[in-house]
From Swiss-Prot:
Belongs to the TtuB family. Disruption phenotype: Disruption of this gene completely abolishes the presence of m(5)s(2)U in tRNAs, although its precursor, 5-methyluridine (ribothymidine) is present; other nucleoside modifications remain unchanged. These deletion mutants exhibit a temperature-sensitive phenotype, they are unable to grow above 80 degrees Celsius. This is Sulfur carrier protein TtuB. GO terms for molecular function: nucleotide binding. InterPro entries: Beta-grasp_dom_sf, Mopterin_synth/thiamin_S_b, ThiS/MoaD-like. The modification 1-thioglycine is found at G65. The gene is ttuB.
Amino acid sequence: MRVVLRLPERKEVEVKGNRPLREVLEELGLNPETVVAVRGEELLTLEDEVREEDTLEVLSAISGG
């Protein structure tokens, strides 16, 4: 799957295999408590199954100010 990270810089990575979002975030070294993931217009939960053909966008859930 293609994963677009915006944390805050933009970076694209490829991840292989179908699995729960939680496992994808762990593989990428991301803390699931500090990011949100979107597939199209759908906000994903950590238990949602993501598939190899998906494109995900991962955004920081914490902002400074």
